[in-house]
Amino acid sequence: MKLIFDIQLFAHKKAGGSTRNGRDSESKRLGVKRSDGQFVLAGNILVRQRGTKFHPGKNVGRGGDDTLFALVTGYVKFENKRGRKVVSVIPAEEMVAVQ
């Protein structure tokens, strides 16, 4: 008695499991938005930041997310005071008087 087996082998690859990677958060576009000596209008954003890397000086407000913004129209001034980076806005009228 003769037995004949017809065995066919096919290419096979077991499906891989799902991965938990493959996503990233959108950038928050933080940083300095206006440079030293630049003319700004009241309400312009000067610095977007997390925490207080820059501190508000004269005529600069701080938002709930630590964003610094101009309270008056004038010129931006960055300076170091007691080891802190401070951002101020010098009103346009004062700059005209100085020149």
From Swiss-Prot:
GO cellular component terms, semicolon-separated: cytosolic large ribosomal subunit
Entry keywords, A to Z: Ribonucleoprotein, Ribosomal protein
Gene3D superfamilies named in the record: 2.40.50.100
UniProt propeptide residues: 1-10
Pfam families: Ribosomal_L27 (PF01016)
Post-translational modification: The N-terminus is cleaved by ribosomal processing cysteine protease Prp.
Any one of the GO BP annotations: translation
GO molecular function, one term: structural constituent of ribosome
Annotated HAMAP family: Ribosomal_bL27
The protein's name: Large ribosomal subunit protein bL27
Record organism: Caldicellulosiruptor bescii (strain ATCC BAA-1888 / DSM 6725 / KCTC 15123 / Z-1320) (Anaerocellum thermophilum)
